[in-house]
């Protein structure tokens, strides 16, 4: 008989190498074939629900790591909640309208001019649906589970209809109106442009400093003082209605040769130099904060119009005077700040960039040519302090390469001011993981201007507005609901296929259209209105979902995006937030914290990670990040993640190998009969389980990642599994000591597999399929382990023992270095009490110390002589073990004997081998 044949070595078909890129798709195919998503829902039917509502990614382009981070985090949550017994459906969605898809088609060579709007929109739809299929495949490959066979898509007729109904309800409440707002306007192509259609080139422009006389000093400034503004667009001076100063900046009133000028103190030297002032003759007479200057009134330099001094945070000291010429009809910042002060929006420029009748004496002039006429008039009025020319980077039309302007054009708005307080109240009633999340969205809503919901594009949901012959707006409950019904039946393309009269209710009349003629709005809705309607189009529409959602989770850019538009439309129509809990994550950067870009060559994409390493590595990486802030990824970081994965996998494999002959139904030992060391590990498992469950509840995956490693390394690898080899391999198969350990080992394996399942979805499933006697067909259909109270006294006792064991290991290491021993089984350990710790008394309640220390012999005495080394938990002496090495277990013994032809066996091994003969 060979010694090896008498050992109970680990046996499992679970492979050491993961081979994830090849194995994961096979596991996913099995899930799909079994329809695991619906099985998991069926299991928890009738239970408490948990709804995480998916913010829709844009249906264009390949997935980036930000997509992966987002969807994997959501999957952690939904899978965990499902395993906790919640009915947790997850319906993924896609955002499908907007300019990028129009541009993508143009790049593909689709010529819009050769087809009708309806035909072009059909092409956009086809393209969006193709993109969804590609992204869907990639999301699923990451192990994300959801209703991918029936996702929500913003271009679906029922969704568009729900969006129109939200618009109608807001219109009903007086929250939708038409006004003017500045947008990028290209006189050369006579159209508005989106930011994506802008490119920057150098342009030579006039640079002027202009004095505005004080008209009403409000008892703050001198009545004969003047504000100095600086601008590079003289043609916008006719549209000036205000001067903006920063509330927190210091401003000075400077006397220069008898004239009193108000400018920012931080810019006084630069202004003095620009205006050729003699520095010796400049005198600072008074100082103010920008806040103190608010509501002082200045006089327009050549029009019979006041210019109000207002506060704005956009004012900087980078250039100019700190007093900003403000024309809400010709600037984004000007418009936003103007809204707060209810300033008029003046924009006397037509589509071609020519002054209209409203431009007075400049009527008929091209805006750029009017620059000279304006500066001449300012000179004539004595208001021009300096004219210069500069070359600077300026926005141009990407098609025509000609300069663009900001020009106020008619736009549709959703009123924020009327619902702002209601939204802020709803935010107060929403839960956040971190307080700064609440502060961020609260401040954004508090400070935002009115919401421009119209876009001058074609690929989107049309604004359901009609016009009578006299230009009157028709936007009634009847007309809007009729459009919603049409969209629900035919989709929104019907708007572009039918005449206005055929989109109105049958027999519709209006006093403004005596001839029965109507026109329809040509603008479409902002895509944020699309996705921001998902609470109605999805949560309230799908039977398995409910409103409001328990949770929204997106990137931190969505505080101004989807989080914002969703709460706006929801509060406006339902009076409550669409989410009870809000969570955000940061952006994915490279290993050094830099933004990923092709030019830097630091881009890592999900497809590459999955193909090279596997989805479980990507998922484990997500769990290793502090996702509330920006996160980092690199080849080196992924290598570290792979190393951690390998350690987890090998630990699970070791446990699988050592329970191959264990049946929990027949071989388990009751808890009270377990060896104390096994009860200690069982309680450590319970402690680890409680902490992991708590971390899942609080979405703290980094804690899970760290605690899993700690549990595996400290409790299992460094102690229990190492200690266990002498029992699992050497002891008799059915011995109490071996079954006691297997009972706990089986529990650790099953519970750890469940606890890891939401993160390492494929590996946990693979482990489960190799675990004997589990009841559920899939770990993902099992329940999370229950949190059980721990025996604290036992844990405290064994923690002290583990500290003492660390001291023994240090002593063994020293003996090894001094060549007293080689392997630890060659050691005899003597431990005694010292001034710091009463080791001899403490160790009386521990059995089989030699096994616990993985040495051959242990002796506990009251005192040792001076040759002993003093440690925190006792004096320790290491000597070479007495006797000879047992050929079977490698422990040293003075009582070696033989069984059959097997010699050099210790008494324990003799007994075991006899039972086998």
Curated annotation (Swiss-Prot):
Short sequence motif 'HIGH' region: positions: 57-67
Enzyme class: ligase
Keywords of the record: Aminoacyl-tRNA synthetase, ATP-binding, Cytoplasm, Ligase, Metal-binding, Nucleotide-binding, Protein biosynthesis, Zinc
Cellular compartments per GO CC: cytosol
Gene Ontology molecular function: any one: aminoacyl-tRNA deacylase activity
Disulfide bonds: none
Catalyses which reaction(s): tRNA(Ile) + L-isoleucine + ATP = L-isoleucyl-tRNA(Ile) + AMP + diphosphate
Keyword Metal-binding listed: yes
Domain of life: Bacteria
TM ranges: none
Name of one Pfam family that matches: tRNA-synt_1
One GO biological process term: isoleucyl-tRNA aminoacylation
Binding site for L-isoleucyl-5'-AMP: 554
NCBIfam families: ileS
Function: Catalyzes the attachment of isoleucine to tRNA(Ile). As IleRS can inadvertently accommodate and process structurally similar amino acids such as valine, to avoid such errors it has two additional distinct tRNA(Ile)-dependent editing activities. One activity is designated as 'pretransfer' editing and involves the hydrolysis of activated Val-AMP. The other activity is designated 'posttransfer' editing and involves deacylation of mischarged Val-tRNA(Ile).
Record protein name field: Isoleucine--tRNA ligase
Organism: Staphylococcus aureus (strain MSSA476)
């Amino acid at each position: 008989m060979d010694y090896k044949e008498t050992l109970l070595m680990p046996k499992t078909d679970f492979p050491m190498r993961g081979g994830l890129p090849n194995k994961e798709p096979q596991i996913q195919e099995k899930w799909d074939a079994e329809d695991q998503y619906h099985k998991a829902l069926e299991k928890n039917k009738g239970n408490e629900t948990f709804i995480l509502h998916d913010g829709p990614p844009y249906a264009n382009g390949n997935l980036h790591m930000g997509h992966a981070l987002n969807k994997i985090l959501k999957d952690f949550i939904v899978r965990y909640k499902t395993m906790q017994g919640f009915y947790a459906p997850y319906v993924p969605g896609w955002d499908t309208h907007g300019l990028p898809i129009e541009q993508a088609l143009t790049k593909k060579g689709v010529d819009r001019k050769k087809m009708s709007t309806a035909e072009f929109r059909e092409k956009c739809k086809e393209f969006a649906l193709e993109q969804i299929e590609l992204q869907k495949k990639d999301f699923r490959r990451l192990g994300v589970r959801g209703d991918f066979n029936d996702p929500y898509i913003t271009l679906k007729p029922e969704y568009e209809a729900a969006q129109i109904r939200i618009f109608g309800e807001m219109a009903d409440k007086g929250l939708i109106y038409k006004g003017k707002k500045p947008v990028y306007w290209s006189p050369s192509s006579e159209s508005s442009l989106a930011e994506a259609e802008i490119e920057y080139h150098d342009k030579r422009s006039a640079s002027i400093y202009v004095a505005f006389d004080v008209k009403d000093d409000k008892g703050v400034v001198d009545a004969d003082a003047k504000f100095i503004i600086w601008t590079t667009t003289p043609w916008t001076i006719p549209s000036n209605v205000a001067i903006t100063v920063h509330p927190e900046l210091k401003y000075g009133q400077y006397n220069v040769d008898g004239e009193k000028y108000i400018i920012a103190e931080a810019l006084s030297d630069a202004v003095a130099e620009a205006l050729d002032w003699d520095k010796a003759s400049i005198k600072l007479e008074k100082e103010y904060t920008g806040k103190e200057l608010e509501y002082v009134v200045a006089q327009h330099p050549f029009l019979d119009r006041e210019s109000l001094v207002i506060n704005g945070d956009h004012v900087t000291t980078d250039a100019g005077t700190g007093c900003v010429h403000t024309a809400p009809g010709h600037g984004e910042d000007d418009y936003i700040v103007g809204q707060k002060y209810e300033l008029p929006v003046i924009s006397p420029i037509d589509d071609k960039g020519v002054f209209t009748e409203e431009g007075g004496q400049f009527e008929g002039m091209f805006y750029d040519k009017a620059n000279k006429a304006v500066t001449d008039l300012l000179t004539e009025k004595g208001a021009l302090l300096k004219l210069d020319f500069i070359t600077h980077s300026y926005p141009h039309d990407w098609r025509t390469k000609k300069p663009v302007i900001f020009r106020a054009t008619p736009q549709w708005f959703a009123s924020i001011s009327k619902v702002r307080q209601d939204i802020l109240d709803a935010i107060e009633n929403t839960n956040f993981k971190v307080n700064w999340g609440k502060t961020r969205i609260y401040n954004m809503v508090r400070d935002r201007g009115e919401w421009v919901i119209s876009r001058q594009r074609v690929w989107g949901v049309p604004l359901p507005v009609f016009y009578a012959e006299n230009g009157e707006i028709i936007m009634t409950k009847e007309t809007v609901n009729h459009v919603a019904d049409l969209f629900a039946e035919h989709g929104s393309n019907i708007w572009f296929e039918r005449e206005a009269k055929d989109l109105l209710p049958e027999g519709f009349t209006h006093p403004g259209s005596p001839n029965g003629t109507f026109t329809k709005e040509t603008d479409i809705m902002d895509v944020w209105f699309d996705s921001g309607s998902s609470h109605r189009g999805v949560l309230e529409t799908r039977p398995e979902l409910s409103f409001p959602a328990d949770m929204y989770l997106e990137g931190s850019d969505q505080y101004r995006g989807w989080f914002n538009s969703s709460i706006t439309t929801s509060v406006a129509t339902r009076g409550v937030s669409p989410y009870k809990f809000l969570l955000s994550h940061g952006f994915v950067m490279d290993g050094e914290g830099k933004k990923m870009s092709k030019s830097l060559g630091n881009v890592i994409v999900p497809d590459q990670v999955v193909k090279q390493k596997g989805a479980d590595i990507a998922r484990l990486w997500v769990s290793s990040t502090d996702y509330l802030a920006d996160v980092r990824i690199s080849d080196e970081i992924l290598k570290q993640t792979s190393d951690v994965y390998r350690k987890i996998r090998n630990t699970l494999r070791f446990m699988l190998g050592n329970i191959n002959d264990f049946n929990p139904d027949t071989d388990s030992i009751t808890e009270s009969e377990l060896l104390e060391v096994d009860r200690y590990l069982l309680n450590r498992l319970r402690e680890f389980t409680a902490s992991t469950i708590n971390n899942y509840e609080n979405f703290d995956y980094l804690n899970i990642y760290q605690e899993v490693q700690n549990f595996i390394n400290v409790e299992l690898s460094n102690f229990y599994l190492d200690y266990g080899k002498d029992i699992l391999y050497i002891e008799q198969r059915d011995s109490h000591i071996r079954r006691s350990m297997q009972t706990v080992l089986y529990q650790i394996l099953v519970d750890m597999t469940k606890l890891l399942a939401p993160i390492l979805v494929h590996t946990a499933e693979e482990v489960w399929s190799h675990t004997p006697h589990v009841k559920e067909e899939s770990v993902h259909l099992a329940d999370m382990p229950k949190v059980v109270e721990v025996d604290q006294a036992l844990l405290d006792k064994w923690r002290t023992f583990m500290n003492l064991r660390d001291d023994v290991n240090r002593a063994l290491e020293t003996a090894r270095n001094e060549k007293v021993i080689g392997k630890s089984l060659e050691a005899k350990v003597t431990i005694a009490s010292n001034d710091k710790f009463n080791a001899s008394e403490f160790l009386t309640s521990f059995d089989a110390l030699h096994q616990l220390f993985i040495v051959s012999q242990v002796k506990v005495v009251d005192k040792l002589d001076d040759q002993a080394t003093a440690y925190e938990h006792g004096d320790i002496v290491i000597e070479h073990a007495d006797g000879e090495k047992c050929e079977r277990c490698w422990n040293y013994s003075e009582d070696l004997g033989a069984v059959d032809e097997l010699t050099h066996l210790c008494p324990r091994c003799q007994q075991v081998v006899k039972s086998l003969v």
